[in-house]
Design a protein with these regions (language model features):
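N-terminal lobe of the biotin/lipoate ligase/transferase fold
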Residues: 1-111, 133
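Acidic (Asp/Glu) carboxylate-rich active-site/surface patches
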Residues: 101, 107-136
């Protein structure tokens, strides 16, 4: 890890969230290591404790991409984060959501980086042709 490394913590995440969102029914979790933030979000929402949850970790030991592909997740090297959202919508009504989320994320990240964040259809964000995110 480099000298500029800042460990994840809940307060750090809250600094980047909209105040209105923080006042809503949202739960935020940060861990040093987890199997998969996506699994954490699914498990949490199955308990229906909150309509919205954020799960972040310094490391994933069983991260997955599309079609069950392994997602390499070394400690402190990337942002491992899943957002869980409890919805009554059918999957067919969510068509295009990953592209919309990708567009918003790319636009937001471009404010913080000198390198252009791009979108690779259907669900990846890239910087300099290297994948930085997958949206599931």
């Amino acid at each position: 890890m480099n000298n500029n490394y800042i460990p994840l913590n809940i307060d750090l995440l809250k600094d980047f969230l909209d105040e209105g969102l923080l006042e809503s029914n949202i739960e935020i979790f940060v861990s040093q290591s987890t199997g998969s933030t996506n699994d954490d979000a699914k498990n949490f929402l199955s308990e229906q404790s909150s309509l919205l949850s954020i799960h972040a970790s310094e490391q994933q030991i069983a991260g997955k991409g599309r079609n069950g592909k392994k997602w390499i997740s070394p400690k402190g090297k990337n942002i491992y984060l899943s957002i869980g959202w409890l919805s009554n919508l059918k999957y067919s009504q969510l068509d295009g959501l990953s592209l919309a989320v990708g567009t918003i994320l790319a636009s937001s990240l471009n404010k913080f980086t000198q390198n252009q964040v791009g979108i690779k259809w259907p669900n990846d964000l890239l910087i300099e042709k290297k994948k930085i995110s997958g949206i599931l």
